[in-house]
Amino acid sequence: MSLSGLLPPNLGGNSPNADGNLTPEEKAALQQAKIIGYMNRISESCVFKSSMAGVLGFGLGGIFGMFISSLDLQHIDPKIYEKPFREQIRIQARDMGSRSFSTAKNFGLLGLIYSGSECCIEAFRAKTDIYNAIAAGVFTGGALAVRSGPKAIVLGGAGFGLFSYGIEKYMHWGE
């Protein structure tokens, strides 16, 4: 990234102050350029990307969980309707909150693992192509199914890898 537009015109090597005697304005511009460079490096790191995906996945999962739990009425005990209205609202709100939190955790973990693995694979291969997403999908599917045994790991990896392939093909449809 070029910072030439952010620096004063006399900050280069042919400046009258090239010996290190910078004006306060030039020092401030140089410091600002360094800070912008640090911020760019931090925001492009795999840790930052995967953390943001986890946080945003948690938020989106909470919204989805709240919506889905409001539609699912089959698990509610019919005896709830015999209770006072406030008690019904309290019970349903507690259930909605717990299910929303559970979905939020799952979405957050999914976003964290997928984006972190895709970023690491991309950095290792030094390429940006569809194979990064497929490999990250296989890794994520397997990692999420690790508690269920080897067959679930293989099926989860294959399924999520195929899903990642489909999403990537859809996203790059016209290219």
Curated annotation (Swiss-Prot):
What is the disulfide pattern of this chain? C46-C119
Leader peptide range in chain numbering: none
Entry keywords, A to Z: Disulfide bond, Membrane, Mitochondrion, Mitochondrion inner membrane, Protein transport, Translocation, Transmembrane, Transmembrane helix, Transport
Where does the record place Low complexity bias?
Answer: 1-17
Q: What GO cellular-component annotations does this UniProt entry give?
A: mitochondrion; TIM22 mitochondrial import inner membrane insertion complex
One Pfam family it belongs to: Tim17
Report a single Gene Ontology molecular function: protein transmembrane transporter activity
Offer one example of a GO biological process linked to this entry.
protein insertion into mitochondrial inner membrane
Q: What do we know about how this protein assembles, alone or with others?
A: Component of the TIM22 complex, whose core is composed of TIM22 and TIM54, associated with the 70 kDa heterohexamer composed of TIM9 and TIM10 (or TIM8 and TIM13).
- Family in the record: Belongs to the Tim17/Tim22/Tim23 family.
Protein's name in the database: Mitochondrial import inner membrane translocase subunit tim22
Q: What is the scientific name of the source organism?
A: Schizosaccharomyces pombe (strain 972 / ATCC 24843)
